[in-house]
């Protein structure tokens, strides 16, 4: 049985968050509910999770020496990555020295870039995926596109939220797509993946939890993407029993191969009864923010419960629910939100992330809604998000 200490006391159970965005903030809050001492880390000050942590630090998390020095200073019981852009070699070394990395350092290393996880899924586990090629320079990139065929998709092997991604329809787009991919990688210029276009009816995120009492699944989450980033998500996504069983089988294989305890966001394409693996994040997923209103245990609560070695038991899904992002475009280091009364009502909630600044378009919050049907919940969430006025 897991023993939890008390924050700010000698017995404290300490969790170090590597990445302190909106997802990390919710993880920090769930840790706080259990009296856990939270140390939030990011590359910039006043990040969302830092605002609800006991302590915070600003470092370059791609600097392995700086990361190891901070871990030696804080001596956390759990190191919890929230983003991909981390010195994963340092995590592997720390784990070998006895530190607990959530879910495992291997999972963090394999999923920090698309090459590691794609090779695991397609080549080691034999799971169905899109056709793909990797390229390290422009000549290899053009060759990969020729092999895959048009249209195709190019992504930096290490990026998130759609950064550096392009949908290539013609050869005239190749040069600009290559340059955009080189600018959008989280660790700078480098290798890309070229993917064939998959025919699918919809995409899902299957939140899969590996815990002391086994593997658990949340109801499938549907979502709409725009410019590579999610705009709305909803739960449950309707799908055939055959497809759901296949999705769960794929997700369980991936999660068990990565190892460790925690929640994983497994992304899948669904076409009829067929299911194709896309990606996996070994941590809460942005599309899973809908679970803040759709389940008795949110994805964040499930992640914390799992990595602490506590049983999940069961997950209750309340019915149709949706999330819609609040995505303004402006420049300010003093953001204010207005017209909130028009955004709230029965079955409506808001989460405003507390990001310290914005320069361009940035996700600053999310509206959450329940409804009679999924379509009703989506419409209510979108209307709530649209009602929020954001000013600098």
UniProtKB/Swiss-Prot annotation:
Cellular compartments per GO CC = cytosol
Key words, A-Z: ATP-binding, Ligase, Magnesium, Metal-binding, Nucleotide-binding, Purine biosynthesis
**Gene3D superfamilies according to UniProt:** 3.40.50.20, ATP-grasp fold, A domain, ATP-grasp fold, B domain
Q: GO:BP terms for this protein? A: 'de novo' IMP biosynthetic process
Q: Cite the ATP-grasp domain residue spans from the record.
A: 119-308
Annotated positions binding N(1)-(5-phospho-beta-D-ribosyl)glycinamide: 22-23, 82, 286, 355, 362-363
Assembly and binders: Homodimer.
Binding-site residues, Mg(2+): 267, 279
Metabolic or biological pathway: Purine metabolism; IMP biosynthesis via de novo pathway; N(2)-formyl-N(1)-(5-phospho-D-ribosyl)glycinamide from N(1)-(5-phospho-D-ribosyl)glycinamide (formate route): step 1/1
**What is the protein name stated in its UniProt record?**
Formate-dependent phosphoribosylglycinamide formyltransferase
Listed GO MF terms: ATP binding; magnesium ion binding; phosphoribosylglycinamide formyltransferase 2 activity; phosphoribosylglycinamide formyltransferase activity
Q: Which InterPro entries match?
A: ATP-grasp (IPR011761), ATP-grasp_carboxylate-amine (IPR003135), ATP_grasp_subdomain_1 (IPR013815), PreATP-grasp_dom_sf (IPR016185), PurT (IPR005862), PurT/PurK_preATP-grasp (IPR054350), PurT_C (IPR048740), Rudment_hybrid_motif (IPR011054)
**EC class name:** ligase
Tell me its family.
Belongs to the PurK/PurT family.
- What catalytic activity is recorded? N(1)-(5-phospho-beta-D-ribosyl)glycinamide + formate + ATP = N(2)-formyl-N(1)-(5-phospho-beta-D-ribosyl)glycinamide + ADP + phosphate + H(+)
Q: Name the source organism.
A: Cronobacter sakazakii (strain ATCC BAA-894)
Q: Which residues bind ATP?
A: 114, 155, 160-165, 195-198, 203
